[in-house]
Amino acid sequence: MAIDVNKFESMQIGLASPAKIREWSYGEVKKPETINYRTLKAERDGLFDERIFGPIKDYECACGKYKRIRYKGIVCDRCGVEVTSSKVRRERMGHIELAAPVTHIWYFKGIPSRMGLILDMSPRSLEEIIYFASYVVINPGNTPLEKKQLITEAEYRQYQDQYGTDTFDAKMGAEAIKELLAEVDLEKQAKELKNELKDATGQKRTRAVRRLDIVEAFIQSGNKPEWMVMDVVPVIPPDLRPMVQLEGGRFATSDLNDLYRRVINRNNRLKRLLDLNAPGIIVQNEKRMLQEAVDALIDNGRRGRPVSGPGNRPLKSLSHLLKGKQGRFRQNLLGKRVDYSGRSVIDVGPFLKMNQMGLPRQMAVELFKPFIYNRLIELGTENGGANNLRSARCLVERHEDVVQDVLEEVVKEHPVLLNRAPTLHRLGIQAFEPVLVSGKAMRLHPLVTTAYNADFDGDQMAIHVPLSDEAQAEARLLMLAASHILAPKDGKPIVAPSQDMTIGNYYLTTEEAGIKGEGMIFSSADEVKMALQNHEVELHTRIGIAASSFDKAKPFTDHQRARIMVTTVGKVIFNEILPDDFPYINEPKSENFNGIDDRFFLDPGTDIVGWFKNESLNGPFKSGFLSDIIAQIYARYQVTRTSVLLDDMKDLGYDISTRSGLTVAMSDVTELPEKGEVLKEAHEKVAKITKQFRRGLLTDDERYIQVTQTWSDAQDKIKSMLIASFDSKNPIFMMSDSGARGNISNFVQLAGMRGLMAAPNGKVIELPVTANFREGLSVLEMFISTHGARKGMTDTALKTANSGYLTRRLVDVAQEVIVREEDCGTDRGLDVSAIMDGNEVIEPLYDRILGRYAMKPVIDPKTGEVIAKKNQMIDEHVADQIIDAGIQTVTIRSIFTCRTEHGVCVKCYGRNMATGDIVEVGEAVGTVAAQSIGEPGTQLTMRTFHTGGVALSEDITQGLPRVQEIFEARNPKGRAEISEVTGKVTSIEENPADRTKTVTIEGETDTREYVLPISARLRVAEGDEIHRSEAINEGPLDPKELIKVSSTLKTENYMLAEVQKVYRMQGVGIADKHVEVMVRQMLRKVRVMDPGQTDLLPGELLDIADFRRANAKTILSGQTAATSRPVLLGITKASLETNSFLSAASFQETTRVLTDAAIRGKNDPLVGLKENVIIGKVIPAGTGVAEYRHIKDEVVAAPVEPLEKIPTLDELQKAFDKEPASSTGNKASNSAK
């Protein structure tokens, strides 16, 4: 039963009726037996019966009368087994006919209880009926009893005696519930509930809305309420609940078999009791046990104690197979293990080019096996190859020489994918061309380590081989490492020289005064290199070189070209790796990128040695400047030239750092003679502070602050003394100054003092570590040092887990956001200006407008000239002009105002940060946004800081907790009150008794009072004007409150600014658009306030797009439209409220999502990525976008060239003989067919 998943448009789920379950089934399972312990064959009518589920061996019936494929489809007359493939045992279902109906625990136990809502009964009453504790009146007849009234056993008997046995009808158990459900008139109930809603309020209204929701769901889905009670239980295929023999003759079996066995045993016993006309109480007890057995099968542990197996371990039921990280969704559908993959330790490969990786031969043989076999067969025996698959296999197993030759051929230009877990962003998987290496470790290019966050201390990486031609083409065109130069989060280069490469280039471009060969003048770069080889000059020597000797394309002015340029030997060598028409880089300044300064050019005949004596030295090129050069090259010359430059920079860096012979020794850590003096002063000051405290002049908090401040000042003093005494040739200084490794504080700890340490609770210990590592620490100092360090380690571990979970939730909520069209045609934009925090600029305007489209023309206020037209992309040049013109606010196209459904349009998104080009239709921008926000999560702090000073012990939540608070739309800590009216602050009263203060605001129509804690810092004073939605006191706003009193756009803008504050404070840059995508996803739902004449329900939560559609339909037919208000959902809630039940079920609360979806008969439109991955369909992003899928079909259907001659029978026969061997390689098998 092969289904082509790429053919269907959507997937629907619903309640299965008993008839449907019987239709699925291939037979009834009547016995609890599994397999016979002697013959090891499946028992007849048992849980593994071959007659029901199909043969255990391929094309062979149970008794062995029919064997081989030629009997396919025949049902054996002896054993009744159909001769077919054993794969059917993965798809054929059976069923159990129950002797008494049982309820489905999902619909009775879920919150809210679906049965309870339909029947208008409490879950407790339902439980009493279902588990045979009480009777329920089904038909009161002419007695004073009421329908659905609960009566106890004793009352039932009493009423029977009182009114007679046939006057009323009361039952217990699931059959009673089934009868009640079957009697429900949904249409009538819906009508009554709608009338009730007109005047109901409070709790009553809430319950009515809930009930109406469920009733409408049943009406629209066509599900019948009585289907929530089962007469038949489906039995899943046996290969999904296998039983395998272990060594030693014991069997391991799936828990489900035990659970099914309990159901069958109890069901059979109940049948027997009913046949025997057993007493009611015994039958009741058996029915209750059957109900409990089915409950345990569906969801063990949901009610009462879970059924446990050996060793008191709870058995895994059907629900558990779907739930959680080990469930079907997350373990087998969203993440599968694949063939043609491997993993190994990685090692550095400095000899590789940017797009290469070193693949160990041993791994390559294993990974490329099908291609090797195919090539060996193509070669044929006459060329040392093979004739068929078997002999090809032998050649490979015997490690024949020909295999290595073929391997070289096969691997050539066949890209492979490398992945390092955790894959935090799209650069966690990149494509490389394999280069065969010896050994067992894969070799990785040193420059891609940043993107992978890899190092060579034992990290492992996974490798995958793309098999099809399309997959190889995509890997080559879209995923080659050489084209991944920019980070998707901020568009800055992520590939930059580090460590040895940085220090090499730093050393190369260092200048020294008065060394060998200073002032020599050369006619060309070659001459300079020759002089260096002959030891006439050194790398750092300042020299002159004829500007005319450089390439014509070098952007020198004519005046400069006729003169002598002063530079150093190293800089001449460095500039050789830059493109010919790129300015000569002589000093580490960004102005140099537009051309070299005239001061570096001297007229021929000038006394160059004398000129050098008066000229100060230029700084060497540090890590940051090297990154700037890469960014410039990328902007001007695109990918290919940049990757060439990177490789050259890497080779040059390694070469020079090796030649420089930089080492670190104890003698490089200089001692500071003045240190003792500084410490003495500090000790005296601390003694003075302690004295004042003892006299009662200071509080303990003040004393603590002053003491820690004293030691902090002492450390700063030592630090500045150290920096002053530094020798610029000191290797440790060079390492930190160049940005290769370490920073100044490391040096201070080596040569100065370690300073103050933090305790595990984050508080600073007031006893400082006065020693440094050169002197060595005392026992107490050592203890103080390690005390806080331990906290650092545990924090990091916790942070990683928290950050990973945040990323998972972000990805889930945004995975359906894909660039779906060119232009959505919106008429709204977003006014952006620099994000400020007080007077501090958090994110400048330049960063916010770069790579976005202008919504309105941007006009220079001074000249009136148009800098950017409407819908024009703002690139670096335009952005510079806007900033230079002094413009403070620009209206841009924003994702917040984009009207594209399930995604965004190109114009509202703008530039793709990872490529620097305009985003393409099909780009999965939601996932990229989620990863961009989640990836730096581990760099954020975990702590809640105390602000300085004693008076303000107000906690500020920062770092990861603050980001979570914003995205989960939680009530923020220490939040500010928001004014709900525009008016004047008339009074501020303090009430010391209850430690509050009351702020009164008088608006035009009403007066509001706000009670705040006494410690709150107010933003307003008496007599101030205040606008609606402004904060009354300091602190973060609650976005859920803000959205009630201001516009959606204002709320979105506030959340964007808050997220940016957290990341930018920690020095992490993230493009606005990523945050915009997330915030928009949190605000895509509205709640219906008044449904008007639409089919919507009051209080219903639905997508803005669906709401607009419903209204448009109503307005067109001249009826009253519905009204709604926007709802802000946290990312977890938003993920679960998605239109795709597959995506929601695979995220969290699997059973709840599926219960709800089944009742509503939900249809999953398969618009997001996750739901398509789950069903194995090509995802609707990238080359899987519908538009591109059709193009592919046209290409395939290109006219076929006529065959030159029709093949003879012999030729065909030969082709078929070869076929099994070549079926692994595409070309050969296609031609054979």
Swiss-Prot record:
Family per similarity comment: Belongs to the RNA polymerase beta' chain family.
InterPro entries: DNA-dir_RpoC_beta_prime (IPR045867), DNA-dir_RpoC_beta_prime_bact (IPR012754), RNA_pol_asu (IPR000722), RNA_pol_N (IPR006592), RNA_pol_Rpb1_1 (IPR007080), RNA_pol_Rpb1_3 (IPR007066), RNA_pol_Rpb1_3_sf (IPR042102), RNA_pol_Rpb1_4 (IPR007083)
UniProt binding sites for Zn(2+) 1: 61, 63, 76, 79
EC class: transferase
Quaternary structure note: The RNAP catalytic core consists of 2 alpha, 1 beta, 1 beta' and 1 omega subunit. When a sigma factor is associated with the core the holoenzyme is formed, which can initiate transcription.
Superkingdom to which the source organism belongs: Bacteria
Biased amino acid composition, Basic and acidic residues: 1211-1220
Protein name: DNA-directed RNA polymerase subunit beta'
PANTHER family linked to this entry: DNA-DIRECTED RNA POLYMERASE, DNA-DIRECTED RNA POLYMERASE SUBUNIT BETA
Lineage per the UniProt record: Bacteria, Bacillati, Bacillota, Bacilli, Lactobacillales
Keyword tRNA-binding: no
Location of region: Disordered: 1211-1233
Cofactor(s) the record lists: Mg(2+); Zn(2+)
EC number: 2.7.7.6
Purpose of the protein: DNA-dependent RNA polymerase catalyzes the transcription of DNA into RNA using the four ribonucleoside triphosphates as substrates.
Disulfide bond entries: none
Cellular-component GO terms for this entry: DNA-directed RNA polymerase complex
One Gene Ontology term of the molecular function aspect: magnesium ion binding
Annotated catalysed reactions: RNA(n) + a ribonucleoside 5'-triphosphate = RNA(n+1) + diphosphate
Binding-site list for Mg(2+): 455, 457, 459
Gene3D superfamilies found in the cross-reference section: 1.10.132.30, 1.10.150.390, 1.10.1790.20, 1.10.40.90, 2.40.40.20, 2.40.50.100, RNA polymerase II, clamp domain (4.10.860.120), RNA polymerase Rpb1, domain 3 (1.10.274.100)
Annotated Polar residues bias: 1221-1233
Pfam family, one: RNA_pol_Rpb1_1
Keywords, sorted A to Z: DNA-directed RNA polymerase, Magnesium, Metal-binding, Nucleotidyltransferase, Transcription, Transferase, Zinc
GO BP annotations listed: DNA-templated transcription
Gene name of the record: rpoC
Entry binding sites for Zn(2+) 2: 824, 898, 905, 908
